[in-house]
UniProtKB/Swiss-Prot annotation:
This is UPF0250 protein VIBHAR_01213. GO terms for cellular component: cytosol. Gene3D superfamilies: 3.30.70.260. NCBIfam families: PRK04998.1 (NF003447). It comes from Vibrio campbellii (strain ATCC BAA-1116). Belongs to the UPF0250 family. PANTHER family: UPF0250 PROTEIN YBED (PTHR38036:SF1). It comes from the Bacteria. InterPro entries: UPF0250_YbeD-like, YbeD-like_sf. Pfam families: DUF493.
Amino acid sequence: MLTINSDAKLKDLLEFPCSFTYKVMGHAKPELPELVLEVIQRHAPGDYSPTVKPSAKGNYHSVSINITATSIEQVETLYKELGEIDIVRMVL
């Protein structure tokens, strides 16, 4: 989760609207990309083509998705909600 200091720094670095990529890592379950897209669509509707890559041992998958972010609040909300998905272990 972002802290107040990192929020201020992130806000200063970004000029909205901007392209923003989320990388979501979770258990290698077939529903992972669908769950990620469901959260993204709630806050940034669009036509997305996420990239899914397996880990070396195949236990985890990473889902990368690029959105057009419109505000720092949207970025923070997506980090929070993507991290709340049960099978997700990390959001970058």
